[in-house]
Every structure is written in C-alpha cells, then in structure tokens.
C-alpha cells in the first residue's frame, strides 16, 4: 500500500453565540441538567454529569481484539460504512488468518500497518480462508440516508460537512447525499495497491499521526481503535521506504486476532463508548471548542473534527 504524507489546516474565529450553541442544545435536551447554568463546563464535568444511557457497550460481534506481545488492541468495526470489507475481516479473524503475522510498517506521524509481509510473493503468501474474498468493490462512501449524523458547526477543508455518526468521525456531502468515514487519529483502514485494487482487509493500518485527510474516500475505512492505541503509536519507526522495516527481526509479531464474540465472556473487553447522538456529546463538543480552563489565554472558539475526543470507558461493574 502506498500512502503519501501531506498536511493542511485553516484557522477561523467563531462568535460567542456560536460557541454557546451546542451547550444550549444540550441543556434543552435535558441530558446534562447540572450543566445548563454553566455554559463553560469542562469536558471532565460534562462526562461526570453523563447518564448511563449516554453510553453504549461494544458489540462483541463487531469488535476485533488484536493481541501483541505488549498487550491488546481493541478495534470497533464499522459495518454500517463498509459491510463487505468488515465481513471479510471477520472471516479472516474467525480463520485465525492474522495469527503469527506481523506489524510491517510504522511510519512516523502517519500509520502503523500490519498483515502478511510476504503477500506479494505467491510462493510465500499466506492463503486466504475459503470464505474470504481476495477482491472486493470499494466502500469509500455510502448513502447518508438514515444516518444519525451529528453535524459539527465548524467548517472543514476536505468535506462540505463533518460530524459524527455511531461513534465515528464522518464527512457528508448534502448535494450527493453521501457520507464517509474520516482518517482521524486511531481510525483503521484497508491497505490496497493502485486501482482497481480496493484491498481485502488482509492488510490493515491505523492512523498514528496528524490526520491524513487527503486519504478520505480513497481507501476503505473499517473502524476505530478504542483501546490499546498507545501500543501501536509507540512502536519503533521503520527505517525503510515509507516506514517499512528493513530487518524482519524488527517487526512485531501478532499473537492473535479474534472477534470479541469468539472469546470467553470473561476475556471480552468491557468497554463503553459515548453515544455521539446525545446532548451530552454536544456539550462535550462545546466544552472543547471554547476552552474555559484557566490555562487558556485565547480559547479558539471552534474545533476540527479530528480534534474532538470520542470517549471510551471501562463499563461500570454490574450492581449486585
């Protein structure tokens, strides 16, 4: 997979009314009544005032657990955006395809990539399981119809509109009524070669640097790392071209990749993700757009989509 690095950004100023708009929405919805009189609440205060219904548990059937020597990486899959690729990845996981393969590329401020290092060598490449496909149509975007899209009020360089849906950062074009996942930090995509190759999911990567948004709608994005991101971001950088390791001994071995639904219940990740369609999430965005902490001299009054935190927490222990 050939991914090129590029940076771009803009800075604009918001009015006080716009800065308070999301807090007003949140207060009207009643999800954070304790914050209604405090438009300058911090993110920590917003989360502390959240309700159990503001959070959702990960679906074990849509959750990948990748075990490395350093620990576990948990990935929430986005079948609602890339159903064919996600189904293929699930087939690969059920067949234990990734077990014993390696992390082959760590490019600074860009991606960590894993899969079969010998995939380009027919004599050495690991065969795909019978129920997995080697070629799939692209899933770079989908219809926006029926999508619970929480639009961010600030502008964007790459998309007409940006926001969040089902816990993922999303771009939307109202003219074509299409939506797509964004290449924010922690997002997971499918490695591919030049078109017409669209990747099968046998080679995956996670964004570990500044969001490479020029990749949006050029690669199928299949999910987001919700735990263990530090394990992927802290790996030694590859010294070869595009961050690939020159020495195979420097690669990190993958001990296993499983769907959480295949793990014993006691070994499944007990994680909850903040719902992005809630007033609590709207209040969180407002808190991050207009930073009220005493450290800030000039709060920005706006925020880019990839700078909005998507909180994950360990699920509270069940009451006896």
Segment roles from a protein language model:
Residues 2, 30-320:
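Cyclophilin-like peptidyl-prolyl cis-trans isomerases
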Residues 10-15, 67:
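Intrinsically disordered, low-complexity Ser/Thr/Pro-rich tracts
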Residues 11, 24-26, 33:
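N-terminal non-cleavable signal-anchor helices
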